[in-house]
Amino acid sequence: MFEEVEVEAYVYPTEDIEKVKRAMLNLIPDLEFEAFDRGDYIILTGKTRSKKALQRLYELFRGQAILDTARSFLEEGYFGEEIIIKVNKQAAYAGVVNFNEESPLGPITIIIRTKDPQRLMKWLAPRTKDGVPIE
């Protein structure tokens, strides 16, 4: 369904890089991390090809009853063979998805690479009627 998931966040001097890693792993498990020091901040990236990579998002979207909102953000971030969404870093650390990426610490960016974005969106965040998936 997807080829790769990449997650990226900027880590500022006031932040603990291990906590940012935890926030990222709370959304996408099995990430392999790399850090790039840019002086004033670190760019932390994690990548995975694990088949279970999107299972946690799948569960969070349903558990938080945000399928319609998630679908809207997935469609908005759909570009060719990539779907890009941005989520709040602090909410992710708490194990919650919040699409309000406005934060002084910056968002966590999730890039899903897929040859079939429509199928992926239909699985991850199907359209609903009265909160019940209809796809």
UniProtKB/Swiss-Prot annotation:
Superkingdom of the source species: Archaea
Family that this chain belongs to: Belongs to the UPF0201 family.
Cited NCBIfam families: PRK00447.1
Protein name, as recorded: UPF0201 protein TON_1346
Organism: Thermococcus onnurineus (strain NA1)
